[in-house]
């Protein structure tokens, strides 16, 4: 007889928990709640301390502080007890200052006592000193992986790694020649790591790094700009060409990594969608390092010669909106995120946001003789909200060689499926019983169930007939819904197209025919366009959703009449002529069946140009889905990261002389890197047949390769090819 299996040691763990309590083992499976997850992380840190020869039980350690921070808002009784226990320990126990060999990734980086630099630093210093350069000094701190917990958006940490030197360059005391070169302060990493866990789970760590180029802003001022293209909307039928709005143009730029192509290459995405069934968004962190600031001057000779010099006293301004104070402006909707090619330098997008502006546009139908009416009301004084970064968000000043880390933000989002559903209402439940079956092979027209339609059993909602058919049998819910398709609505600030969730409807699978709600992306060379000429039309693609939850606008009809009456023109909605002779109206413009019985899938991840996460609306009634991103952050989302080259003034600056400052032309190159962590569930096979997966053939393989001058494109990839049943 085989010996009994050894059970994991539970220790003094209260009911309902697996790790909250002393003496338990670290193999209890998934934690039961956030407090239990914090306890598991705490236990792992203690184990690391013990392995390194330190006793965390007699000292107050960083792991204890981390547990206090993670349970400060705990609602469960165990988390509350643990929180106050370690607060009491903090008050009486001596502090354990040394960190374990593998510290956690969720504690703020703080300046610590300077440690002895490695030997190669002294060798480099000796060489520089011999050449006449200054010495390098460095504040030794932990790398970005030791960033801060970011429950409310993150607490940034700045590390100064600045070189000092005499230099012979011009422009703000900048260093030129052989001086002013700092020590490399980070690593360039674009690998995607897959860690296979228990019970079919996979931890996916996407690393991304980019060289970012940032020019100084055209102006140091905030500007309120009114955009008015009334020449277009003055023509009847052109309401959809309306561009009128007001925006605040700022001197800052936005570093936005919120797009799938920033994090995954095409091969990574193929592996994910072919083997995983769902994605969970876990955490996000980012860092700026190896900051370089340079000035540009021109000689007086003809033709003029530009001279570039390192400026060790110029500053890069960095602000992290960790509390989401500023308007949320995801750049993926304008295809202005960081670029998708790790080996190509990229630029951040100039940051701007909408400002309140009332107007009325009364359109004219193309078949009428009237002209559109445009009335501009201006800004309502009750609605003015002018935001400035300088007085709303802490701003950090970085100089050559400095670093900035945001810390780690942990997401609270619902998971995203990587499978699609094929069942519509006609495929739900138990099919009708067939009294007889086909007797010959290949029969395709077996049309008789064998029981008269008024003699069948079952449930319908037809009160005036006894017929039970596949059309009348009662289904549990409605899969998908009829939406206002291609409809525009008026708002106080102008018309907008109604968003609808993407879904496959009818037979529309041609990418040139927009199916129900399928998004269409236009993008440039940073984000997948192959052409190398300037000023070209952006490349485009339409992402056809696989979910069978849409409608077929070109061929749908809706009948709303008594069952036993003939169909009349005023009681049926057809694709054309839906209401008593009025032509040119699609029924989906005026009919909406969304209700409490509607079943709908989330939007798919759109690789590479789609947005990953979105911010939850601050409204009492919140939308259940957002059509631009599969992950909607509950309560808070990662803080937006803003950068700006600080004003580098000349001695001629006079604040009263001109609206434009007298500045030295200065720009910055810096390295950005980030880490985005997912948890994914491996997809299990439950069917006999193999399924379609993301693949390529010999012909389209070359879409992923550069040509002889380096031009290449990123082809969009499907994310929900694998089918699943929904009922």
Curated annotation (Swiss-Prot):
Residues 19-64 are annotated as: Phospholipase A2-like. Keywords: Capsid protein, Clathrin-mediated endocytosis of virus by host, Cytoplasmic inwards viral transport, Disulfide bond, Host nucleus, Host-virus interaction, Magnesium, Metal-binding, Microtubular inwards viral transport, T=1 icosahedral capsid protein, Viral attachment to host cell, Viral penetration into host cytoplasm, Viral penetration into host nucleus, Viral penetration via permeabilization of host membrane, Virion, Virus endocytosis by host, Virus entry into host cell. One of its GO terms (molecular function) is metal ion binding. The keyword Metal-binding applies. GO terms for biological process: clathrin-dependent endocytosis of virus by host cell; microtubule-dependent intracellular transport of viral material towards nucleus; symbiont entry into host cell via permeabilization of host membrane; viral penetration into host nucleus; virion attachment to host cell. Disulfide bonds join 633-637. The capsids of autonomous parvoviruses expose a proportion of VP2 N-terminus and part of that sequence can be cleaved of to form VP3. This is Capsid protein VP1.
């Amino acid at each position: 007889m085989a010996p009994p299996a050894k059970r994991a040691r539970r220790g003094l763990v209260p009911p309902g928990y697996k790790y909250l309590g002393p003496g338990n083992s670290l193999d209890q499976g998934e934690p039961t709640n956030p407090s239990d997850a914090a306890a598991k992380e705490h236990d792992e840190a203690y184990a690391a301390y013990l392995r390194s020869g330190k006793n965390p039980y007699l000292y107050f350690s960083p792991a204890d502080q981390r547990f206090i921070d993670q349970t400060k808002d705990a609602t469960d009784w165990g988390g509350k007890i643990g929180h106050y226990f370690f607060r009491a320990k903090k008050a009486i126990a001596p502090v354990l200052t040394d960190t374990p060999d593998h510290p956690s990734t969720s504690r703020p980086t703080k300046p610590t006592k300077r440690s002895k630099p490695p030997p190669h630093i002294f060798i480099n210093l000796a060489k520089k000193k011999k050449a006449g350069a200054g010495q390098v000094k460095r504040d030794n701190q932990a790398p970005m992986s030791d960033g801060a917990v970011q429950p409310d958006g993150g607490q940034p940490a700045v590390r100064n790694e600045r070189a000092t030197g005499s230099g012979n360059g011009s422009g703000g005391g900048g260093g030129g020649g052989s001086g002013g070169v700092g020590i490399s302060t980070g690593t360039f990493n674009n690998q995607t790591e897959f860690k296979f866990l228990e019970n079919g789970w996979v931890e996916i760590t996407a690393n991304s790094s980019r060289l970012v180029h940032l020019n100084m802003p055209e102006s140091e001022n905030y500007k309120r700009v009114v955009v008015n293209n009334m020449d277009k909307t003055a023509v009847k039928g052109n309401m959809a060409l309306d561009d009128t709005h007001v925006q605040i143009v700022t001197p800052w730029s936005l570093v936005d990594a919120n797009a799938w192509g920033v994090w995954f290459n095409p091969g990574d995405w193929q592996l994910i969608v072919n083997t995983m069934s769902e994605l969970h968004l876990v955490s996000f962190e980012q860092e700026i390092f190896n900051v370089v600031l340079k000035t540009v001057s021109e000689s007086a000779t003809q033709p003029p010669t530009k001279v570039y010099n390192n400026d060790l006293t110029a500053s890069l301004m960095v602000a992290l909106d960790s509390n989401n104070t500023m308007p949320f402006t995801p750049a993926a909707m304008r295809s202005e995120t960081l670029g998708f090619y790790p080996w190509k330098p990229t630029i951040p997008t100039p940051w701007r946001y909408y400002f309140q502006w009332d107007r009325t546009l009364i359109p004219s139908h193309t078949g009428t003789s009237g002209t559109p009416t445009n009335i501009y009301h201006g800004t309502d004084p009750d609605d003015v909200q002018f935001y400035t970064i300088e007085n709303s968000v802490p701003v950090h000043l970085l100089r050559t060689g400095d670093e900035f880390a945001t810390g780690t933000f942990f997401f609270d989002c619902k998971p995203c499926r990587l499978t699609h559903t094929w069942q519509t209402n006609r495929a739900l439940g138990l099919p009708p019983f067939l009294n007889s079956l086909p007797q010959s092979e290949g029969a395709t027209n077996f049309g008789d169930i064998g029981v008269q339609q008024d003699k069948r059993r079952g449930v319908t909602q037809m009160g005036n007939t006894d017929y039970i058919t596949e059309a009348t049998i009662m289904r549990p819910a409605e899969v998908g819904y009829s939406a206002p398709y291609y409809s525009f609505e008026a708002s106080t600030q102008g018309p907008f197209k109604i968003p609808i969730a993407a879904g496959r409807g009818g037979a529309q699978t041609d990418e040139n025919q927009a199916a129900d709600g399928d998004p269409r992306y236009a993008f440039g060379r940073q984000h997948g366009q192959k052409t190398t000429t300037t000023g070209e039309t952006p490349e485009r693609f339409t992402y056809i959703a696989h979910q069978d939850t849409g409608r077929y606008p070109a061929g749908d009809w809706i009948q709303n009449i008594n069952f036993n009456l003939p169909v009349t023109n005023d009681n049926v909605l057809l694709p054309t002529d839906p209401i008593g002779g009025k032509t040119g109206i699609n029924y989906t413009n005026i009919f909406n069946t969304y209700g409490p019985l509607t079943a709908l899938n989330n939007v798919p991840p759109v690789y590479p140009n789609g947005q990953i996460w979105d911010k939850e609306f601050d409204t009492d009634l919140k939308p259940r889905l957002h059509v631009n991103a599969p992950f909607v952050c509950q309560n808070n989302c990662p803080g937006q990261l803003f950068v700006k080259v600080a004003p580098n003034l000349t001695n001629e600056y006079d604040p009263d002389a001109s609206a434009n400052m007298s500045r030295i032309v200065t720009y910055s190159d810096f390295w950005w890197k980030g880490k985005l962590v997912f948890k994914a569930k491996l997809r299990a096979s439950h069917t006999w047949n193999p399924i379609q997966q993301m693949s390529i053939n010999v012909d389209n393989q070359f879409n992923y390769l550069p040509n002889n001058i380096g031009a290449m494109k990123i082809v969009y990839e499907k994310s929900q090819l694998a089918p699943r049943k929904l009922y």
